[in-house]
Amino acid sequence: MNHYLRAIGSMLILVYSMLTAFLFIDKVFVNIIYFQGMFYTQIFGIPVFLFLNLVIILLCIIVGSILAYKINQQNQWIKSQIEHAIEGETVGINDQNIELYNETIDLYQTLVPLNQELHRLRMKTQNLTNENYNMNDVKVKKIIENERQRLARELHDSVSQQLFAASMMLSAIKETKLEAPLDQQIPVLEKMVQESQLEMRALLLHLRPLGLKDKSLGEGIKDLVIDLQKKVPMKVIHDIQDFKVPKGIEDHLFRITQEAISNTLRHSNGTKVTVELFNQQDYLLLRIQDNGKGFNVDEKLEQSYGLKNMRERALEIGATFHIVSLPDSGTRIEVKAPLNREDDNNDD
């Protein structure tokens, strides 16, 4: 709206300035026509002087509105290009076939190298991540991984087995005739044990995550989903495209997927989780979505170790990390990681 007002105001000032200059310069026009004719001659019952002013104002409004609309189109297009650049997507797409002004094209041509530089920095971040993946910190990660494996084994051999035994005992007790209030308490206890088993499986997934080993990212996620479908009551759906992704990036994305699913199993109280992986040419899209209870993103993002860990992993590979969640509306996590197009071309 501000663009319209500025354009209309500018046109009015310009036209009136030209008209005033013309009237002052041409004294003959002022004496003969302006005073003698315009006040006495009428058009549609309106003095010519007033009619001409109304026509000029109307023309200014029409022309100014058209110009303001076109300028607003240019600004919106540039804004969309900047947003594409920030997200790591291709710039220069003109879906609405807008006629671009020379100034807009000049600004776009300035934006292109900035987008290329941003993409280069993202890829450099990925390369550094791949290099760090094979450096000395792998030893530290190995020590931590071994400790996590040890804790996971102990939990599986002790607590997990005890929960399973308790579940079997409760199932057997349910088959017998019980008097009140035991007949009402046993189902409650059984539900609590089942929830504890689900929590334990999520914790074991967090402590002892499956590794990709020689698998691709797509294959690893599919195997993870198939394994979960056998062990958890929640419905797990996947839509996975299998394509080449650098090893260091694959590992980070796989860990993000595991962390997101683990959080879903432990906290969402949902009945379904969907895992999607797509190749969008310039970038890949990883999406994990559930139909659970949701949460306040601003509060949880600072408090939850899991969410912060996922965001940090995404930033390490130059990816964007977005969470959309509302109470009673589920949660959606999206990770967009740029793909190295030059490497893909070389592989071809």
UniProtKB/Swiss-Prot annotation:
Membrane-topology descriptor: Multi-pass membrane protein
Enzyme Commission designation: 2.7.13.3
Segments crossing the lipid bilayer: 13-33, 43-63
SUPFAM superfamilies the UniProt entry points to: ATPase domain of HSP90 chaperone/DNA topoisomerase II/histidine kinase
UniProtKB keywords: ATP-binding, Cell membrane, Kinase, Membrane, Nucleotide-binding, Phosphoprotein, Transferase, Transmembrane, Transmembrane helix, Two-component regulatory system
InterPro entries: HATPase_C_sf, LiaS/VraS, Sensor_HK_TwoCompSys, Sig_transdc_His_kin_sub3_dim/P
One of the Pfam families matching this protein, by short name: HATPase_c
Keyword Transferase: yes
Compartment annotation: Cell membrane
One Gene Ontology MF term: phosphorelay sensor kinase activity
Catalytically driven reaction(s): ATP + protein L-histidine = ADP + protein N-phospho-L-histidine
GO cellular component: plasma membrane
Role noted for this protein: Member of the two-component regulatory system VraS/VraR involved in the control of the cell wall peptidoglycan biosynthesis. Probably activates VraR by phosphorylation.
Protein name, as recorded: Sensor protein VraS
Species: Staphylococcus haemolyticus (strain JCSC1435)
Record gene name: vraS
